[in-house]
């Protein structure tokens, strides 16, 4: 949830040509933590217990809180300056009257659904398929490790190609990878394949999504507008976590949750294509 704040804060300080690279670096830094957290948690739970594990994570949170105090507002780049007369209400009306923004909000729901379904239910899913707990740890750690590469790569590609097309490709690839994962015989090799390939796509949706919002509306209300998009992501995260457990309790299997994840990927692939990425007239006049 907190990641939307530094991503938007960094995004305010870069032009459209460089923004996805900058936000890709921020997202990659988050992935370093995601790579280390499963390994660290698995180790500390086995050596010092859950009480000390929670205490260690409290220290990490305090570290993040302290460092956040040093994030000071700086002057935004002039080419991204929006009309000073625009207030919050006008910005919200403008955004929700833009079809592309509504589609972006809908599409990011899918990202939240998928990554939380994987992050929450892969451990149980792997045990159901006869593989040990360390297999899930390996998958989640590989996801974090390779997402560093994925977010940096998509950040660079976002400076060269259409961001909406990149998002459609990312979601389409997710559908293929999930299908291969659930329909293939369970093995450590397939688990490694899934961790690597899904990791490349894990948070790679963040830089182009943030970039589209800033590109269309400017950066004055970027944190708020991207925060709303991210709120949709978190609703999807709730749905992915809840439905995974619900279907398992109902049918004794995660299969239906995976089927929904694949269907949502196809939906997201299509829903991003009609987005008009061009800056609105107000932003063009101010550039």
Name every feature range the model reports, one short phrase each.
Residues 1-28:
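Cytoplasmic helix-loop-helix junction between adjacent transmembrane helices
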Residues 10-20, 213-222, 252:
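Paired intracellular helix-loop junctions of major facilitator superfamily
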Residues 19-38, 227-240:
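Glycine-rich segments within core transmembrane alpha-helices of 12-TM secondary carriers
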Residues 25-76:
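Helix-loop-helix hairpin linking two adjacent transmembrane segments in secondary transporters
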Residues 73-90, 281-287:
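Flexible cytoplasmic inter-helical loops of multi-pass small-molecule transporters
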Residues 98-154:
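Extracytoplasmic gate region of multi-pass secondary transporters
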Residues 143, 160-212:
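C-terminal transmembrane helical hairpin of 12-TM major facilitator-type secondary transporters
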Residues 151-162, 249:
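Helix-to-loop junctions at the C-terminal end of transmembrane segments
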């Amino acid at each position: 949830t907190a990641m939307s704040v530094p991503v938007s804060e960094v995004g305010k300080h870069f032009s459209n040509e460089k923004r996805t690279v900058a936000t890709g670096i921020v997202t990659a830094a988050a992935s370093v933590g995601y790579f280390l957290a499963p390994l660290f948690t698995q180790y500390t739970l086995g050596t010092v217990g859950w009480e000390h594990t929670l205490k260690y994570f409290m220290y990490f949170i305090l570290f993040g809180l302290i460092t956040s105090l040093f994030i000071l507002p700086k002057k935004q780049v002039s080419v991204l300056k929006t009309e000073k007369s625009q207030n919050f209400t006008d910005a919200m009306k403008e955004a929700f009257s833009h079809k592309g923004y509504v589609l972006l909000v809908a599409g990011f729901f899918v990202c939240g659904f998928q990554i939380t379904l994987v992050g929450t239910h892969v451990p149980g899913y792997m045990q159901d398929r006869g593989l040990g707990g360390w297999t899930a740890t390996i998958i989640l750690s590989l996801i974090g490790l390779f997402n560093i590469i994925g977010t940096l790569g998509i950040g660079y590609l976002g400076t060269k190609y259409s961001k909406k097309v990149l998002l459609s490709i990312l979601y389409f690839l997710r559908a293929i990878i999930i299908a291969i994962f659930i329909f293939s015989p369970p093995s450590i090799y397939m688990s490694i394949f899934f961790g690597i390939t899904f990791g490349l796509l894990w948070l790679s949706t963040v830089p182009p999504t943030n970039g589209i919002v800033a590109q269309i509306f400017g950066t004055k209300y970027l944190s708020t507008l991207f925060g709303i998009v991210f709120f949709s992501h978190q609703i999807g995260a709730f749905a992915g976590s809840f439905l995974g457990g619900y279907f398992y309790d109902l049918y004794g299997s995660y299969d239906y949750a995976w089927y929904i994840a694949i269907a949502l990927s196809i939906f997201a692939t299509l829903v991003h294509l009609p987005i008009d990425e061009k800056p609105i007239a107000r932003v063009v006049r101010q550039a």
